[in-house]
Amino acid sequence: MTNELVYEGKAKRLFKTEEAGVLRVAYKDDATALNGVRKESFAGKGELNNQITSLIFSHLAEAGIESHFIRAISETEQLVKEVSIIPLEVVVRNVMAGSLAKRLGKEEGEQIPNAIVEFYYKDDALDDPFINDDHVLYLEVATTSEMDTIRQAARSINKVLQELFNQMNITLIDFKLEFGRDAAGEILLADEISPDTCRLWDKETNQKLDKDVFRRNIGNLTDVYTEVLNRLKQVQN
């Protein structure tokens, strides 16, 4: 196993492997907020996110949605197909919350009849600004056809995830996706899907079961991530 680091982000490290086109992802215990301004470490967080992402990506594969995920290889690591990440954060919103509620002057918790799909330019120095299709084309981030593919994939993923989280008695408020191009130019779902990248509320109590407990100092991060993993395991069995 090689330890040549390819990339290090806020929550993960990517390493080369002996197999061409395959990378090893190591999940970190770090949690960040405010685009990295606030940072803390939580023992076991990397393991939780690796397990949650592995289960969710496997579930999506069973539903016919392809991703870069190959398999988990340890408590904190997984193998993935190497892709060139498209610098877009694709946010799917089912319920008013967070920045969207502030931007539109709406109350948190208001249901959105048809899910909203948004694009944000992935650039920490610019604080990941909200952009539209014309910006994407101007920046040469993706073509019109690729944006259509990404939007369609995001809506398909949303449908599958809503059904999954409903079984877990959790409301999928919103979530962030990233996509990449493989060696053949095919667009694949990439990155992770975990409480780091989703807003999740308990259906009965509206308890927040995601990174908002860290952002807002309203709970124990590892406790709520463990709760999500336990519910996920229950519906997967």
Swiss-Prot record:
A GO BP entry is:
cobalamin biosynthetic process
Keywords from the UniProt entry: ATP-binding, Ligase, Nucleotide-binding, Purine biosynthesis
Q: Name one GO molecular function term.
A: ATP binding
Q: Which CDD domains match?
A: SAICAR_synt_PurC
Q: Which PROSITE patterns match?
A: SAICAR_SYNTHETASE_1, SAICAR_SYNTHETASE_2
Its recorded reaction(s) are: 5-amino-1-(5-phospho-D-ribosyl)imidazole-4-carboxylate + L-aspartate + ATP = (2S)-2-[5-amino-1-(5-phospho-beta-D-ribosyl)imidazole-4-carboxamido]succinate + ADP + phosphate + 2 H(+)
Q: Does the keyword Magnesium apply?
A: no
The protein's matches in Gene3D superfamilies, at most eight in alphabetical order, are given as: ATP-grasp fold, B domain, Phosphorylase Kinase, domain 1
Record EC number: 6.3.2.6
Pathway given in the UniProt record: Purine metabolism; IMP biosynthesis via de novo pathway; 5-amino-1-(5-phospho-D-ribosyl)imidazole-4-carboxamide from 5-amino-1-(5-phospho-D-ribosyl)imidazole-4-carboxylate: step 1/2
Q: Which SUPFAM superfamilies match?
A: SAICAR synthase-like
Family membership noted in the UniProt record: Belongs to the SAICAR synthetase family.
The record's annotation in NCBIfam families points to: purC
Q: What is this protein called?
A: Phosphoribosylaminoimidazole-succinocarboxamide synthase
Species per Swiss-Prot/TrEMBL record: Listeria monocytogenes serovar 1/2a (strain ATCC BAA-679 / EGD-e)
Lineage, broadest ranks? Bacteria, Bacillati, Bacillota, Bacilli, Bacillales
